[in-house]
């Protein structure tokens, strides 16, 4: 099936000023990126992904290919939520492939995915990274409005993230929601309506100190909102995964933002040390 939208983005590191930049970019159909900007002085470049069509319909296929070269850093966000409407013609699909070079960094924090009544959505993300690179992803799934006020009026949701490091799989996260099989109760959504997943795979950053700091953040946010949020942290090779359940996106964003603040603090120290080392040996 021909993609309804395509995006190819290649990010490289410029040694003269330490900035990351788009070495090449290509888009076609219903995908675009806004003009890049630099949110801080560490050289990371930020791109905003937009879908001028406003949402996904049945049969839509979107292909995204991102490569971050050695020493480069990219922040990728979206302009608005990913909205999945009725899909009688077949599922809406988004396929993303990411390649990270040595000491490369990708931070992907899109707006929530909203799946409306009668919608089916499949999302696959494959990350190929070096053991010296960093990958962060934070996603939230929100049920769309339904005329009968049910939280799970959509037909099906499947979000799969696969992370490969040096050719070895270090993470396979598989989120499947099929409301025909009751997902609201124990062992699935536990009575909550919104779910969040934050993945950080970052061998240069994720030592015991960082892991314990992240654990403390999760517990602190969890206990500050007893009854409004459930969350847990699992350690994986080179990093960790945080899964959250809540009644609204804001509670999940709260825990994501706290973890991302920790991550950015550690990243700044790491990239600063890398830069100092590079200057020392140049």
Swiss-Prot record:
Q: Which domain of life is it from?
A: Bacteria
One term of GO molecular function:
nickel cation binding
Signal peptide stretch: none
Q: Where, per UniProt, does this protein localize?
A: Cytoplasm
Q: Which UniProt keywords apply?
A: Chaperone, Cytoplasm, Nickel insertion
UniProt key word Chaperone: yes
Q: Name one GO cellular component term.
A: cytoplasm
What's the family?
A: Belongs to the UreD family.
Q: How does it assemble?
A: UreD, UreF and UreG form a complex that acts as a GTP-hydrolysis-dependent molecular chaperone, activating the urease apoprotein by helping to assemble the nickel containing metallocenter of UreC. The UreE protein probably delivers the nickel.
| PANTHER family, alphabetized | UREASE ACCESSORY PROTEIN D
Summarize the protein's role: Required for maturation of urease via the functional incorporation of the urease nickel metallocenter.
Instruction: Output the HAMAP family linked to this UniProt entry.
Output: UreD
Name the chain's protein.
Answer: Urease accessory protein UreD
